[in-house]
């Protein structure tokens, strides 16, 4: 993968629950200007499960066009890791082909949820999607949401047998699993998919992060990753410790409920709107978010 720090973008909605394209573009530009290497549209945090196929594709297009038209501080272009996950292989395949056609740099594909395929089913699912495109593919293991895990032998087999499967987003919560993957395949790039473990995964062989907190604090997430890549353990740990209470607050309810409310409180999105079955956070969660953002001087 040609990037290391990335944010799993929220999808802002208007009051009528249509996608707020202007705010979405502004959020991506903010990521670019604050030093992130890549953005990840329409993943879990982007509420992809409740977007229509047309909306999903359009969000990918917006991300790609915004990144093409906005230079980073180093005068380069931020990469787009397009989410193409679905519990139907045919739909993921269609989204993958579309993402490649419109210029995505790579695709992120989650394991099918609800279906609970066998390991052979997971292998065939990912292989079929990856072989339909030429751009790099990042597997996404998040068993708490999908009900099934990509077991280490399956992940390694995919990496070894499918040339454009290059990376895996690890949200299993298991550092033992991260260590095992890195032990057997040093070139299989591991990305943290769990903000509270960013530092631990980076110093267990990780190559980057796909961060939820990065929506709010892209500069600090980028700094932490860059320090880790330079083997500056203590500096990276200081940033991780600084962000830890924010990481915790953003996951007190189902993601992306807290992060969208936090971004609203911070003035980054106008409407903290959600599509059912997701609903607004509790009053207790809002108070916690307000207190946490005050501690970080994000709000007064």
Swiss-Prot record:
Subunit structure: Homotetramer; dimer of dimers.
Taxonomy, superkingdom: Bacteria
Any Gene Ontology CC annotation: cytosol
Recorded name of the encoding gene: dapA
EC number(s) from the headed UniProt entry: 4.3.3.7
Family label: Belongs to the DapA family.
Subcellular location: Cytoplasm
List of catalytic residues: 140, 169
Marked site (Part of a proton relay during catalysis) residue numbers: 44, 114
Residues annotated as binding pyruvate: 45, 210
Example GO BP: diaminopimelate biosynthetic process
Function summary: Catalyzes the condensation of (S)-aspartate-beta-semialdehyde [(S)-ASA] and pyruvate to 4-hydroxy-tetrahydrodipicolinate (HTPA).
Protein's name according to its UniProt entry: 4-hydroxy-tetrahydrodipicolinate synthase
Catalytic activity: L-aspartate 4-semialdehyde + pyruvate = (2S,4S)-4-hydroxy-2,3,4,5-tetrahydrodipicolinate + H2O + H(+)
Pathway given in the UniProt record: Amino-acid biosynthesis; L-lysine biosynthesis via DAP pathway; (S)-tetrahydrodipicolinate from L-aspartate: step 3/4
UniProt KW keywords: Amino-acid biosynthesis, Cytoplasm, Diaminopimelate biosynthesis, Lyase, Lysine biosynthesis, Schiff base
GO MF annotation list: 4-hydroxy-tetrahydrodipicolinate synthase activity
């Amino acid at each position: 993968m040609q990037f290391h720090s990335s944010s799993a973008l929220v999808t802002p909605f208007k009051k009528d629950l249509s996608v707020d394209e202007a705010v979405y573009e502004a959020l991506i530009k903010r990521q670019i200007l604050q030093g992130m290497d890549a953005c990840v549209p329409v993943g879990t945090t982007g509420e992809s499960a409740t977007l229509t196929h047309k909306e999903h594709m359009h969000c990918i297009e917006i991300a790609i066009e915004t990144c093409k038209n906005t230079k980073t501080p180093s005068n380069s272009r931020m990469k787009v890791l397009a989410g193409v996950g679905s519990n139907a292989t045919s739909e993921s395949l269609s989204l993958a082909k579309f993402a490649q056609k419109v210029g995505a740099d790579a695709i992120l594909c989650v394991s099918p949820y609800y279906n609970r395929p066998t390991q052979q089913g997971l292998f065939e699912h990912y292989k079929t999607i990856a072989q339909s495109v030429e751009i790099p593919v990042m597997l996404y293991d998040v068993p708490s949401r999908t009900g099934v895990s990509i077991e280490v032998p399956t992940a390694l087999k995919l990496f070894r047998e499918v040339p454009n499967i290059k990376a895996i987003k690890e949200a299993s919560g298991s550092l033992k699993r991260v260590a095992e993957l890195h032990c057997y395949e040093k070139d299989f790039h591991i990305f943290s998919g769990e903000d509270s473990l960013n530092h631990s995964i980076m110093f267990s062989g990780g190559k980057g992060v796909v961060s939820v907190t990065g929506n709010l604090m892209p500069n600090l997430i980028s700094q932490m990753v860059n320090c880790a890549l330079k083997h500056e353990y203590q500096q990276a740990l200081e940033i991780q410790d600084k962000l830890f209470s924010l990481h915790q607050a953003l996951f007190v309810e189902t993601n992306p409920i807290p992060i969208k409310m936090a971004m609203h409180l911070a003035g980054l999105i106008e409407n903290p709107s959600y599509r059912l079955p997701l609903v607004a956070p509790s009053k207790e969660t809002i108070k916690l978010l307000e207190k946490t953002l005050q501690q970080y001087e994000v709000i007064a």
